[in-house]
Amino acid sequence: MPGPCPYWSGPAPVNRLSNLGYVILRYDELVRVRIKKLIFVLIAAYVLIIARLFYIQVIRAPFYREKARELTVRKIALPARRGTIYDRDGQKLAVTIDACDIYVQPVKIKDKEEVATQLSQILGCSRTQLLDTLKSDKKFTYVARRADIWIGDAVTRAKIFGTGSIRTTKRVYPGGTLAAHIVGFTNVDGKGIEGLERVYDKQLRGTDGYVVAEVDARGKIIPGTRRDRVEPINGGDIVLTIDSTLQRSLEHELEKSYKAHSAAGATAIMMEPKTGEILALANMPTFDPNNAKNSSAASRRDRAVTDLYEPGSTLKAMTVCAGLEAKAVTPTDIFYCNASKGIGRRTIRCSLHPPFMAGHGACNVAKILTYSCNIGAADIGFKLGGERLYKFEQAFGFYEKPDSGLPGEVRGWHDNWRDWADIRLANIAFGQGIAVTPMQMAKAYSAIANGGLIMKPYVVKEIRKPDGKPEQQFMPTVVRRVMSESTSAMVSEMLQGVVSEG
């Protein structure tokens, strides 16, 4: 065996086999450590998952059950049916019929162009407007409200993804413009906005019910999942004092006069003097409550109770009543009309027309009414004096609301009688410088025809429960006595002369 190389001067040789074994042992140990760590991590993760599941399924179970219930269980409204409005003879003036709302869910619709085309054909509306709606990022929106039932059925049959219809009801007015200012109208959600629809909204609308049930992805109730149900209570019905036949005739005649004179507005009222029942009431211009959204505010205004007018010669009858009742004048007293009369620095005049171009001459009280003599009415006013004339006008109801039950009523306008100069007193005696509503004037004239008793005007005769039984009935109400029966009889006879001779 050869010995060490005599020329090697470095360190002694190492036993490499033993070192190799040492390295191999250390690598095995490293693998075992890593495996142990991995197992530990997996166990820890598993424990955390179990803990999280326990937290979610046990500890937080009530919370997530409620969340799930909110997603699948709905409280769905069951709308009450709005009551019907009838005239005094049972003719329907306002009814509720079945309808539907059409909706879309834009975020769910992919082919918006095609859906817009299909829907526009069914709804008969603008494709461009529909497309604008579909391009929005809304989750839900209506594209038609209170549409006819057949439209909803057509949408359902089309099975267009992201669209649908909801059954509902809508208000319809069979007579169109008939008694529109009395009946009023509702908004798209069935809430009374004007007229008696507004005044009696609570009685008409009833109380909505509801059903609690699970729904599917399209919002439809899953059969057999109903948990609770409360039935709706339908609204009550209202019976008016209005006679539709008289109402239609009054509207027709008023419209002819309104157009013939190119008037800015016109009003007519028919009132039963002995009871205060309003049999007919019309205004021009008018509107169709079936299409109220396209009407003007002027056409919807109930001028009969909201507008003040200078009554003019129509007030002379009240001046005559006051003079006779206060015994300031007698039926046989004579007054002279020379066409004009100086009062201080002012002059009042009568309207001159054949055969009275020079004035009305000698007039008794009846002739003052027959010829509508301003000077004669002023002279009666002077005999009464400001205080008594004012108190009679107050008794006739000119300075209080008529309380007819119609919305928007106002009081008449006047100034303090203590401030009336002679010319002011004269003007008021023949109907100038004072403002009243047509309803107040109708109420006052009814007192003359009713033996001197003023009746409370009213338009609602009865409110009925949903089953048709009476809930509330409105009866004639005496407000006060304004004059004696004898004065009433005298003036009533005088007023006949206004028609036959005036």
Protein language model annotation of sequence segments:
Residues S9-G10, K443:
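Intrinsic structural disorder/low-complexity segments
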Residues N15-V23, A94, V215-R227, A268-S313, ...:
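Beta-lactam-recognizing serine transpeptidase/beta-lactamase-like catalytic domain environment
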